[in-house]
């Protein structure tokens, strides 16, 4: 055996798994198709928002939250209507995982992260607040905790731990190693086979080449697949698109780099993995094309307040709960029900100055760079620098 565990994917999930495995004394090989510059995957580009329940940040804002309320909200949003009580049902393990995660978010999650050095912006955001009755979709209270340092700040402690383990000889990071097959022996996954891609100096987030330079095979008694989803492959998205939302949009923009291609899902299924709930996807409707793109079709999500008018393609105003940040999937269906795949956001410079922000680490350099002076500058008149750049 080449290692105790092989981890496929060097994004946040892969790094967390690897760090914890190393702390448990395991030898780990991490393989990833991208170059070292992309260590951390798509999490690097995120706003760094984390779901926490009953946190000190909430209490300072006099937000009353609990595990019971969070679980009620989760049930109202997820539904879990696909045989959740049957171990063979699609929602059985989904519900079990969700309950464990809510308990984690209301329990040790914040203390664990704080112990690793993660800190939070003192203002808690209210994402997906719903707009229905209390037992319907959405968060009853604000739970969106912004990491001080955004996505890179979430990654930092795990990158540090994995690099230290690599230096100590407990981890091998093999970049430009693309897995094409999971090796199955006597019904168990015992390794990976794939292609070594040519060296690439592609910058983080930009597309790297897929030119082969060789083959590889590695073996281990355990293999963890942490390879990410299908967000950058519009054809895979369309193939899994649910009928309940209507016809998939003809034109889409992309919130993640090109390497988020979903390849390992089909590869894992071929090896015997069970894929469930493929049609339960999450697509933001408040996206606009990035004027300065990093990856193909680069889209950025607007984080607006309530004052702008949101109109369909024919100029008719959307009704409740189709407001920005309230119920993303309901709004997506409302847009597609019009027969068009776009909508209009009518606003003013004054509203933009007071209410608009953009999602993503690169669109919030003050928070990402942990610059208190720049953050305080948000209180000054006018939009933030990134918002102004979009307006210009």
Q: What do these predicted regions represent?
A:
Residues 265, 271-392:
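An anion/pyrophosphate-binding glycine-rich loop and adjacent beta-alpha core
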Residues 9, 195, 220, 226-227, ...:
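Short, well-ordered coil/turn residues at beta-beta hairpins
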Residues 92-216, 234-235, 288-289:
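Conserved redox-cofactor binding core of oxidoreductases
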Residues 13, 36, 316:
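Conserved Rossmann-like nucleotide-cofactor binding loop
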Residues 199-291:
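Glycine-rich loop(s) and the adjacent beta-strand/alpha-helix scaffold that form part
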Residues 44-75:
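N-terminal glycine-rich dinucleotide-binding loop that anchors FAD/FMN and/or NAD(P) in oxidoreductases
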Residues 23-44:
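Glycine-rich FAD pyrophosphate-binding loop
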Residues 5-30:
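N-terminal Rossmann-like FAD-binding beta1-loop-alpha1 element of flavoenzymes
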């Amino acid at each position: 055996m080449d290692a105790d565990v092989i981890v496929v994917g060097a994004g946040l999930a892969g790094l967390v798994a690897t760090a914890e495995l190393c702390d448990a004394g395991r030898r780990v090989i991490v393989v990833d198709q991208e170059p070292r510059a992309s260590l951390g995957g798509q999490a690097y580009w995120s706003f760094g928002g984390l779901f926490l329940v009953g946190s000190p940040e909430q209490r300072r804002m006099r937000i009353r939250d609990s595990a019971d309320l969070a679980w009620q909200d989760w049930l109202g949003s997820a539904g879990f209507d696909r045989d959740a009580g049957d171990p063979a049902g699609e929602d059985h393990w989904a519900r079990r995982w969700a309950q464990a995660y809510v308990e984690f978010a209301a329990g040790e999650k914040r203390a664990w992260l704080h112990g690793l050095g993660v800190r939070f912006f003192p203002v808690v955001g209210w994402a997906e607040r719903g707009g229905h009755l209390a037992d319907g979709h959405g968060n009853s209270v604000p739970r969106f905790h912004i990491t001080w340092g955004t996505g890179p700040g979430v990654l930092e402690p795990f990158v540090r731990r994995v690099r230290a383990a690599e230096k100590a000889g407990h981890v091998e990071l093999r970049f430009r190693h693309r897995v094409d097959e999971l090796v199955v022996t006597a019904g168990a996954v015992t390794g990976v086979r794939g292609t070594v891609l040519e060296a690439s100096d592609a910058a983080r987030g930009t597309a790297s080449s897929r030119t082969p330079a060789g083959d590889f095979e590695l073996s281990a008694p355990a293999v963890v697949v942490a390879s990410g989803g299908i967000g950058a492959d519009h054809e895979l998205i369309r193939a899994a698109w649910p009928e309940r939302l209507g016809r998939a949009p003809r034109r889409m923009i992309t919130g993640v780099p090109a390497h988020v291609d979903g390849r390992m899902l089909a590869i894992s299924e071929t090896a015997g993995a069970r894929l469930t709930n493929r049609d339960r996807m999450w697509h933001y409707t408040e996206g606009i094309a990035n004027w300065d793109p990093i990856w193909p079709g680069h889209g950025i999500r607007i984080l607006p307040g309530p004052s702008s008018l949101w109109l369909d393609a024919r100029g008719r105003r959307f009704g409740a709960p189709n407001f920005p940040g309230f119920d993303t999937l309901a709004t997506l269906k409302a847009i597609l029900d019009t027969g068009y795949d776009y909508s209009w956001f009518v606003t003013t410079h004054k509203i933009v100055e007071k209410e608009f922000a953009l999602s993503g680490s690169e669109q919030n350099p003050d928070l990402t760079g942990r610059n208190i002076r720049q953050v305080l500058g948000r209180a000054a008149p006018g939009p933030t620098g990134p918002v102004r750049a979009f307006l210009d």
